[in-house]
Amino acid sequence: TGTFRLADLVGMDTAVHVINGMRQNCPDDEQVAALEVPKFLTFLTDNKFYGNKSGQGFYKKTGEKDPKGRPVVLALNLETLEYTQSQKEKLPVLDTLKQIDELPRRIKAVFKADDKGAQLLQRSFLGLFAYVSNRVPEISDTLYAVDDALRAGFAWEAGPFQYWDMAGVAECVERAEKQGEKIGSWVKEMLQAGHTSFYKIENGIRKYYDLRSKSYQPLPGGASFILLDNYRSNKPVYTNAECTLHDIGDGVLCLEFHSKMNAIGEGILRGINDSIQIAEEQGWKGMVIGNNAQNFTVGANLMMIAMMAYQQEWDELNQAVNIFQQTSMRIRYSSIPVVIATQGYVFGGGCEFSMHADAVVAAAESYIGLVEVGVGIIPGGGGTKEFAVRLSDEITKEGDVQIPRLIDKFKSIATAQVATSAYEAFNFGYLLPQKDQVVHNTARNISEAKAKVLELADDYVMPIQRKDVYVLGRTGLGALYIAAHSLKLGHYASEHDIKIAKKVAYVLCGGDLTSPQTVSEQYLLDIEREMFLSLCGEQKTLERIQFMLENGKPLRN
């Protein structure tokens, strides 16, 4: 939330109290001493325009809508103190930053740009850097505690000293002083002693600059975390354009994705298969699949699927889907334990991989789901098959409890349910209590996954592919078709949604079988792939894929 929008949320009266309270309680703070209630804020409080709670503040809703159906919102002109039509400012730096995934590269790009948006960001960052340099050791003896507090308390991706490292400490000191900022003397002493950063990695150990000893010290508790940046200086066990295999110690490997948004393409599929083969042939104890990015993965590379579907390259698409399925099966049926560590988005193929792993260590803030229906297809990397397998393990061959459980599984896929936390993922069937676990500190998920690999490695026996999957055939299909049509009658689904839902139902029930019976996993994978390919030939599916690629949100057609 931006500064003025946040003020509307908090309330102008509260903002004034905060300013006055800070001036009273922090008299020696050079920034607080300069704080004054601006004219426009006095205007708002005098007129009791407190923000959201009074109906208007810096912004004012009119109740009207523009030609595109969006609410018309007026903004306060800070000079005239009148409300005018708010307009989005065109800032080239934002267009540049949207193209960059890695946070360090984004910060460097901010300081290289020269438009007014970049200048605002630069002034803000330099002011922040100067301020925190003067608060250490006043409020904390260690700089990492300041970073930790702002990351934990305000959900920042990095703390101010970490941002400063990304931008370049010496360069920012020079620019800040030109801007009129006063930098803490200890920072200059650090630079003069030849120490050019606040943090560094030495022999795989992350260290911070300690003011007391004027040297680098290991971060406390660092052994509890596995940060893959700490292994960058080591030669990788394996690498390609989309993933890298690291030796994280104790005979355990970690495969890290680094494609754009960690989307699963040919490189990641090949990397998973090659990495498992390396682990098996070279005698490693097991493998973690995980990364320290904001999101584990957004799922399959949709552009790759779209190109083959538009060009009607059905043999190539069939082969690509088959490779995806066999990669999921390779994760499950290898001679070493494979544990997946997740955080952030775990969509589509990422969810399918996790369902096939020996175990999942999910950060509490993992948003897990099979979202393929939103782009007009079904989960085709083994996810629909795996739901049929899990249903088989839950139900008995007798009793009416079968159909309600079947409908629950069906709804998870057909309505593209995304768990809003790792705990909710258990309710949707994406995680299983007997094998998966949740960690509250996202930074611990890879280290916990490594511990799980070591726990499983002793006496690990490669599973045998299932040929005893109990499916309901026509008995289940009838119930699911009724459930699908009830969604349409309730205006929750379109005709194309129903077509997709019926394909999901077909796989979950093992096809149009005359009676309930047992089938093999490969049988289910074959019909899953058949249903996936049939939907790729639908015009409405192609429209959904194109709309998602162009707009980043699903089309309901």
Where are these regions (language model features)?
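Extended, composition-driven regions rather than compact fold-specific motifs
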Residues: 298-300
